[in-house]
Amino acid sequence: MSTQTGYLLVVEDIPDILNLLEATLKFKGYRVVTARNGEEALDVIHKERPDLIIADILMPKMDGFSLVHRLRINPETRRIPVVFLSATYVAPEDKAFAMSLGATRFIEKPVDLPTFLPIIEKILQQGVPTSVEPLNEYEFYDGYRKRLEIKLSQKNTQIARDERLIDTLSEDEKVAFKKSLEQAIEERKDIQALLDQIRERLENTTPRHKPS
C-alpha cells in the first residue's frame, strides 16, 4: 500500500457512502474528518483548514453548491480545492455550474475508487489552485434556481412515468418498484424545499450588474 499525506474533509449525508470514503481514504494514509452537511463542514473548516474538500451536492441544511459558494466569497477559504460527488446533478449544465462556482473536479456517483483515488492524489500534488473569481450572490442564486427547476421537472416526469408503469408489473416486481418510487418522491420533496429557499433568497437579493 502506498501511503499518502494530506488533511481531507469529506462532506456527505448518506452514512454508507460517508463511511466508505472515510475508511478508504484513511486506509490510504490520509487524515480525514467528516461532516454531514455544509453547515457542519463550515464549522470544521473554521477550526482547521483542510487541504482538500470532497463534497456531495444534495444535502440537508446546507448543500454542496451553497457550501462552495460560501468558501469562494471568503478570501481565507477561496483557494481550498473542492471535488464534487453527485448522482443527481450529472447533466453537462450541472457540471458547468459546479465549475463556475470554483469546483476543482466533478465526479459522478457511484464512485469508482480505483479512478477516484488517483484524482485525489493528483490534486493534492498540484498544490493550491489558482483563485477563481466568485459569482456574486444574485448570479449564484439565479444559476442555482435554474438547475433546481430543471431537476424538479425531470423528477416530476420520472414519478408520473413510474406511477403509470407500476400497474403493469407483477406483485413481486411491485415491491421493489414501490421502494424506488417512494425514494423518488422523497427526492422531489427535497428538491422542492431547496428550490423554495433559493427563490426566497433570490427575491431578497439585488442584481449586481457589471459596469459597461
State where each predicted segment sits.
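Conserved acidic segment of CheY-like receiver
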Residues: S2-D16, L21-L25, I53
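Receiver (REC) domain active-site loop signature in two-component systems and cognate sites
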Residues: M59
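Alpha4 helix (beta4-alpha4-beta5 surface) of REC/receiver domains from two-component response regulators
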Residues: S66, Y89-I107, T115-P118
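Active-site residues of response regulator receiver
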Residues: D56
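Short amphipathic alpha-helix used as the core "switch/output" element in two-component signaling
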Residues: D43, F65-R78
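Helix N-cap/capping motif at the beta->alpha junctions
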Residues: T34-D43, G64
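CheY-like receiver
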Residues: Q126-E186, D190
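C-terminal output helix
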Residues: V111-I120, V132
